[in-house]
Each structure stands twice: as C-alpha cells, then as structure tokens.
C-alpha cells in the first residue's frame, strides 16, 4: 500500500535470453497464459492505462489497469476485472502510437517467489522476467536455469509501454540500426 492508501506494485524486471517454451512447460507447478495487452489514450491524471485479455482458449479474463510510477521499482497499480463487453468498449480508446503486445506468460513458483517470464511474439532472442516483492529491499532469487542478461527494472526501453511502441527490445533496435540484424 502506498502512502496515499492506493495499492502499490513493487517488482524487479530482468532482460533474459528467450527460454525454450517446452522446457518451461515441464517445470512442476508452472502455468502458461496467453496475454494481449493494449495501451489506451492518456488521461490528465498521469496514470498509464491499459486493457488486457489473459488466459487460454478455454477461459479468458479481462482487466483494466492504471499505473503510475512513485519510486524505484514501485508503482501505484489499480486493476479491475471487467466483462468482455467493457474490454471491447475500452479497446476503442487504444493509443494508436502503440501496438498491442502479444506474449505468453509462464508463472513459476521458485524459492518463495513467483517468477513471471514473458515470451513476446516479436522476439525470438529475448524475453523478460518479473518478480513481485513485498518491499524493494527483499532479496531476489534468480534461477540458474535462466540466462539473465541485465537488471532492467528502471530502464525505460524495457517497460511493456515502451515495448509496445517499437515491438522490439532496445538491443534488437540497435542491431537493426547498426546493420547487423543478427
């Protein structure tokens, strides 16, 4: 909870080498969801708004989320589960400067933490790992079976909001601009 009494999200985010999806499916207690996330036009209150469709072909959940940064790795997060009709209505407010992000999220319990690995449809090389924490001082336990490239918690180019502008990680943009396109 933030000082204002609003719900607070505290997390660390890492750029990782894209793991093998089949390997992730074999991890006990792992869960896979498909996610489509669309950013909406800004309002005056400074909150980033988005809608999300999450689930599998058998069951979908729709959410409307508002986030605002308040400190290192900390954001106010207001999230509501909404009916599909409201989701479709809010999609009409999509920010045309951003593309919808499609990803597979693999949630894995690991050493009393929940790992959230996002595998994006636009990248065959990279993925992200997010770990929500009770407070910013809580130590993070990173699994040895993931190739961690960098802590990108406060790096703008790695937020889902930024990724939705280019549908590429900063490293991929640099490779393309540099003519390497590896």
Regions found by a protein language model. Give the residues of each.
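Phosphate-end processing signature that detects enzymes handling 5′-triphosphorylated RNA
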Residues: 1-182
């Amino acid at each position: 909870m933030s000082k204002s009494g609003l719900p607070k999200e505290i997390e660390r985010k890492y750029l990782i080498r894209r793991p093998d999806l089949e390997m992730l499916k074999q991890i006990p207690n792992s869960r896979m969801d498909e996610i489509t996330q669309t950013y909406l036009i800004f309002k005056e209150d400074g909150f980033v708004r988005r809608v999300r469709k999450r689930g599998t072909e058998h069951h979908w959940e729709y959410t409307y989320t508002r986030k605002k940064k308040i400190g290192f790795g900390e954001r106010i997060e207001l999230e509501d589960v909404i009916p599909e009709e409201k989701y479709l209505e809010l999609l009409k407010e999509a920010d045309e400067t951003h593309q919808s992000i499609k990803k597979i999220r693999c949630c894995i319990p690991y050493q009393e933490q929940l790992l959230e690995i996002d595998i994006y449809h636009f990248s065959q090389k990279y993925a992200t790992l997010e770990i929500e924490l009770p407070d910013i001082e809580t130590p993070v336990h990173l699994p040895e079976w993931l190739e961690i490239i960098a802590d990108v918690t406060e790096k703008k180019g790695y937020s889902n909001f930024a990724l939705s502008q280019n549908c590429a990680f900063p490293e991929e943009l640099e490779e393309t601009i540099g003519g390497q396109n590896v």
